[in-house]
Design a protein with these regions (language model features):
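Nucleotide/pyrophosphate-binding catalytic subdomain
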Residues: 1-127
Length: 127
């Protein structure tokens, strides 16, 4: 029987947490479909990636510059990627996300990008 497993934001908030999730997935061959959330809070006072993406969406909607906000999100993912020792760059994906926010992509788009990006990281980590 094949299983679908969903991991929440706090369980994918850092490279250390990613490794634990990887161990869980690898421990049961029937866990074939993985649904990752966007990275959540790493510690009290931290900001969830989804909230950071919503902030970009709202700023872009007002015509404000969002490059700095995008870079903060990208740095968060890069920290995870580096901690997992992956040879992975998300530059193209972040450029596309920034372009789409500026073109007034909706709030649903903002909500989905964290999961989208974490899916890429997870797929590369699991091989």
């Amino acid at each position: 029987m094949k299983k679908v497993v969903k991991f929440g934001g706090s369980s994918l908030a850092s490279a250390e947490q990613f490794k634990k999730v990887g161990d869980i997935i690898r421990s049961d061959e029937s866990r074939r479909y993985v649904v990752p959330s966007a990275p959540g809070k790493r510690f009290d006072g931290d900001i969830k990636v989804t909230d950071m993406l919503y902030e970009c969406y709202r700023a872009a909607e007002k015509g404000e510059k969002i490059a700095g906000k995008i870079k903060k999100i990208q740095a968060r993912y890069q920290e995870i990627i580096d901690g997992l020792e992956l040879d992975l760059k998300l530059d193209e994906q972040f450029a596309e996300i920034e372009k789409n926010f500026i073109a007034q992509a909706g709030s649903d788009y903002a909500a989905s990008r964290g999961e989208f990006l974490n899916g890429i990281v997870m797929a590369n980590y699991l091989g």
